[in-house]
């Protein structure tokens, strides 16, 4: 089952395809399809101006409502304090949101984070109105043949704008969940001013991240950490020099693993409450079953290039001692192949886009060169120094990010349907 961790990474940052649900490629570029003709450019500018005006009115409406309330407590971030003192505010997340709705939510996150849910509801209502309006026009309007190309471009442009807005709404909600947990996201990884050259100068917050998950889910997360850190699990102060690209791959894979774990854990906790768990997922596993489970983990290690690269060539046998039996792992191993594949699939293009863009904001866009022999040229691959404690913090954040992403995707889909499966 944990071979899923390795199979999830199919490109330098994220996998290249979703399940066959008609959603197309999972690898999304940072900017949606654009048009080079001047007419379309004017249309795009007009659409963005209209969206910006709507967001400005929304901000005025929400802040006016907040001012009339005497008893609310504003949980202001350090960024708002910096802004009031005239210094440049620090970003609260690596990815800077670009759409008018995204920038609007960024302001709310900094100044009035408790108003984010209301702001999101407002933005989703506007998205639904826009989508309904376009659907009615498509059904009722008789478009002359000479205008059909322009009409399709307008519709495509609006759809791309809605998708980007939806991505940034999801991202803002994930960031808000980290703020509620009082855990700051790791900033963009850049050359360090630390004398040791280490990039991991951020706060650890490991205990807070661990407490955000159910006991059964954390057992799986601990095993995931054991696969990545190997024998260094007990020596977190050691520093390693490792490819920045590899760290980015591990981070992205861990986000997707967290998404998968939360999805499975949600079903597990429900069946546990209803006392309908399958017999194989209780704690009465035989030693043979436990040995088979450990073998599955060892097989996952041998097929996981990122794990092998970071752990310094530790063998699968070396990892075996770190892997512990887990009720949730036994539960997942009881799935048939079709169910396992379905649970391992990220459901929406928007969620995939967030994973890709957030990872690129953290580690930069990888510059990958393929040699004539078909191998990857690593000469331009930047090396960074990071402690194993810093790597543990990154992985825990990534798994938590994926878990939160599952939560907010489900929450938003209940109000604005966009998940295809």
UniProtKB/Swiss-Prot annotation:
Induction pattern: Induced transiently by UV-B, ozone and wounding.
Organism: Arabidopsis thaliana
Protein name (record): UV-B-induced protein At3g17800, chloroplastic
Presence of keyword Acetylation: no
Subcellular location: Plastid, Chloroplast
Domain of life: Eukaryota
GO cellular component annotations of the record: chloroplast
Ranges of compositional bias, category Polar residues: 16-28
Pfam family, one: DUF760
Disulfide bonding pattern of the chain: none
């Amino acid at each position: 089952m944990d071979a899923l961790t390795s199979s999830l990474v199919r490109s330098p940052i994220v996998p290249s395809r979703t399940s066959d649900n008609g959603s197309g490629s999972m690898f999304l570029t940072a900017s949606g399809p654009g048009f080079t003709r001047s007419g379309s450019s004017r249309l795009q500018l007009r659409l963005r101006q209209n969206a910006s005006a709507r967001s400005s009115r929304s901000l005025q409406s929400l802040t006016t409502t907040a001012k009339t309330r005497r008893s609310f407590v504003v949980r202001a971030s350090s960024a708002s304090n910096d802004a009031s003192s005239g210094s440049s505010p620090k970003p609260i997340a690596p990815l800077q949101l670009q759409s008018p709705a995204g920038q609007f939510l960024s302001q709310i996150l900094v100044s009035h984070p408790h108003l984010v849910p209301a702001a999101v509801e407002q933005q989703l209502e506007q998205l639904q109105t826009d989508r309904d309006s376009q659907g009615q026009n498509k059904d009722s309007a008789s478009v002359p043949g000479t205008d059909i190309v322009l009409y399709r471009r307008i519709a495509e442009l609006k759809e791309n704008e809605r998708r980007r807005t939806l991505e940034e709404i999801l991202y803002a909600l994930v960031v808000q969940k980290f703020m509620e947990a009082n855990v700051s996201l790791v900033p963009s990884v850049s050359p360090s001013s630390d004398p040791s050259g280490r990039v991991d100068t951020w706060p650890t917050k490991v205990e807070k991240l661990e407490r955000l998950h159910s006991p059964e889910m954390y057992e799986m997360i601990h095993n995931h950490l054991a696969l990545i850190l190997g024998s260094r699990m007990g020596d977190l102060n050691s520093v390693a020099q490792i490819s920045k690209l590899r760290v980015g791959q591990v981070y992205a894979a861990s986000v997707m693993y967290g998404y998968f774990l939360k999805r499975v854990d949600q079903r597990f906790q429900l069946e546990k409450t209803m006392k309908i768990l399958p017999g194989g997922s209780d704690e009465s596993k035989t030693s043979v079953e436990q040995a088979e489970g450990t073998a599955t983990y060892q097989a996952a290690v041998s097929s996981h290039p990122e794990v092998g690269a970071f752990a310094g060539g530790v063998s699968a046998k070396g990892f075996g001692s770190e892997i512990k039996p887990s009720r949730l792992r036994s539960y997942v191993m009881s799935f048939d192949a079709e169910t396992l594949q379905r649970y391992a699939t990220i459901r929406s293009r928007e969620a995939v886009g967030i994973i890709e863009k957030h990872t690129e904001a953290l580690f930069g866009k990888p510059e990958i060169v393929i040699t004539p022999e078909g191998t990857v040229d690593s000469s331009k691959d930047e090396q960074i120094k990071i402690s194993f404690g810093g790597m543990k913090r990154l992985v825990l954040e990534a798994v938590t990010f994926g878990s939160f992403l599952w939560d907010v995707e489900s929450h938003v889909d209940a109000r604005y349907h966009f998940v295809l499966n």
